Amino acid sequence: MSYMKNTSPFLPGLHIQSLRKKPRSSAQVMADETRYKIEKSLLGLKACFGRFIPEDYLENNATGKHSRHRIFNKETTFWAFFSQIIDADGGCAEVVKKLKTYLDFKGHQSLSASTGSYCKARKKLQETDLVEILEHTAESFLVNDDDQPLAGRRVVVVDGTGLSMPDTPENQAEWPQISSQKKGCGFPTMRLLGCFDLATGALLSHGIGSKKSHELPLLRKQHDTFKKGDIFLGDKGFCSFYDIEQFRKKGVDSVFPLARRIPKTEQTCIKKLEDNDLIIHWNRPAWYKKAPLPKEEWNQLPKIFILRQIKVTVDQPGFRVKSFYIITTLLDPQLYPARDIAELYYRRWSVELFFRDLKTTTKMDILRCKSPEMIQKELLMYFIAYNAIRHLIYESAHTHEKDPMRLSYKGALQALRQAEGYFNHAADSLKEIRRLRRNLHDSISTQIIPFRPGRSEPRCLKRRSKSYQLLTRPRHEMSEIKHRSKYRAKAA
């Protein structure tokens, strides 16, 4: 056939015309344009946090999920998810409408208001990639020794908290509700344990379990977080002979209050350093069924520990506890005075404030996703966003010579929300981005938390809740009491 004639005398049998690249369809061209404009709409977040989250973590995969050119590729999906976390509403619909509004403003109306494509793209994000990004945000803090709380050593403060999530069969199977609640009347509950850097507030690692999970087993899964020279700081729930030994092997010292043991006296101590400051010994407890080691391995633990016991007297009004004992492996009274150790434990309360920033300010207390797989990704994104904001706070503090723990996390989040749109408009100008970044640091540095040591406020609600009935049976079986505002329960 004449039209199949070879046009190249140098390559006999080869049809040059058939090797031409297939022209792209109008739909493919429009998809590329939409993806490019969506990426530009998220450049504000990238300009703020791109130096904390390297681009190579967000490149499309070679094969498998997020390997094809889509509107929501890997990088776009990540930054859209990030934007969803820091938004005041935090819903999928809000972030999609934000992107659609930007495209409409640019005269490009090809993005649907449906959240289906975005939710499918979120599901394709690999949990291992998010874990690597979180570890990078935690390890990239450059902290001076002068900023460390005690003798230039990093202090890792640990505590646990609870979270709830949508009532779906999958979530209930993974994190069941408490047994005292009727089926259909409660929500899945999760136990979360976090390890935080006391100097920066950054989350170093985390562990999750059901509400029945004790915090000690969750901590033991995170022992690799601790490095030689660190100091472990915890509450009385972490007072454990076994864990002291595991930390000692890693070159990590421990500070926690005494629990489940009778304090030593001057008559039974090894040495008295000062009043209420004693060098003591602990005997290895007898093996028990729920011990973390088999009996043979348990008996190989040291029979005696040499520790330090410090009695702390609380003479400030408003505190329930009047005195307590601190146990520590920091034995040198010259390098670690008793007063410094007591003040370090006093700062342990900061971990409660870190969780408040996550749960109340960033609204992580009630998770949104409906499957365990997405719940874990949602948690990781919350932690990544939290660490990234902590980076901004730490930079602002050093730029303006302020204490990073005195700068407001909520103030930083508010400043970031307002500045995000201006970063988007300045995305093409590096000079303008630097100017906006300086302005953002200035804004964050002005949000200083007042110094209120020893403040005591009861955890009570002043605003009364509405007079709605409590759900005491599944909703489809529940009947509403008429005139509930006038209803009074009869005495038994």
Role assignments for model-derived ranges:
Residues 2-96, 124-125, 132-133, 137, ...:
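Single, function-defining residue in the core of a domain
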Residues 108-127:
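Major-groove recognition helix of helix-turn-helix-like DNA-binding domains
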